[in-house]
Regions:
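N-terminal signal-anchor transmembrane alpha helix
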Residues: 1-28, 32
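Transmembrane alpha-helices
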Residues: 135-139, 171-205, 231-232, 236-237
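C-terminal transmembrane helix and the adjacent membrane-cytosol boundary/short C-terminal tail
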Residues: 154, 231-268
């Protein structure tokens, strides 16, 4: 019964999709002299069957795997770069308040820029290629993650850190046993947010500034008015986004919820 309830939204979505497709039929223009050549009908919204058939064709030809792997690669490169630099800069900035006061407005301004601004700049500076999606993802991921990590470090017990300096505890040990455990909650929250936004930003950047990838395929599908293909690639983006949300982001958020974790342990 529970499994059926989970399938109900999907069934309703497919039925509404099919209904919208039936209502979107338009009559095309006549060809030639119009004699004996009736105008052909076309759909603005393809049926689920047409979309699935086009998706199967993309998978069988290898086009789906090729472009999807490129999108994932670019997104992961930008994600890793953004998280790494956020961690490297966030820790010292959280410990040094004057440095944080100087950098915080700059990072906040960077965070305020929408992805389309970075895409425009990078298309001029770097041209179409892998650089644009990677750096756009970095620009979207770095600011919130940096501020999150710096906030976590600033919230550490500074008296304990002062004791480590007095007793000359090695910095590597302080980092491993005090700093990293203390900011783990903030780091996991940053990773959860970054994973959620990376996929969307990567596809958007590819739409404008990449020679390949899922976003680039969407661009050409809409240019060619190939609606089944456009919907098929859209379904790919949604499927990967849902998989990331359910398989990675939600478990990370649940790991950050002490009440839920406590409840599970009590029941066990």
């Amino acid at each position: 019964m529970r499994c059926f309830r989970k399938l109900v939204p999907l069934i309703v979505l497919l039925l509404l999709w099919w209904l919208a497709s039936s209502l979107s039929v338009r009559q095309g223009q006549e060809t030639g002299d119009g004699v004996g050549q009736p105008a052909t009908a076309y759909r603005l919204i393809p049926t689920p069957w047409e979309t699935g058939r086009e998706g199967a064709r993309l998978a069988s030809t290898g086009e789906l795997c090729r472009h999807l792997s490129l999108t994932v690669f670019r997104g992961m490169c930008g994600l890793v770069l953004g998280l790494a630099i956020a961690l490297i800069l966030g820790v010292p900035c959280g410990l040094l308040r004057p440095v944080m006061e100087v950098l915080s407005p700059l990072v906040t301004a960077m965070q305020s820029c929408p992805p389309i601004i970075w895409i425009s700049f990078l298309l001029v500076w770097a041209g179409i290629g892998n650089v644009v999606p990677m750096l756009v993802v970095f620009a979207a991921v770095f600011p919130p993650c940096f501020l999150n990590v710096a906030q976590g470090v600033a919230g550490l017990d500074h008296r304990l850190l002062e004791m480590t300096r007095v007793y000359r505890v090695p910095r590597g040990r302080v980092l491993r046993q005090i700093v990293l455990p203390g900011i783990s909650r903030f780091a996991v929250a940053s990773l959860s947010f970054a994973l959620g936004i990376t996929w969307k930003v990567t596809a958007t950047a590819e739409f404008f500034g990449a020679p390949s990838g899922v976003g680039e395929r969407i661009y050409w599908s809409q240019r060619e008015m190939n609606m089944p293909r456009l919907f098929a690639w859209t379904a790919v983006i949604i499927a990967v986004g849902v998989a990331l949300e359910l398989g990675v982001v939600q478990p990370l958020r649940e790991a950050l919820d002490p009440e839920k974790g406590g409840g599970d342990s009590d029941r066990s």
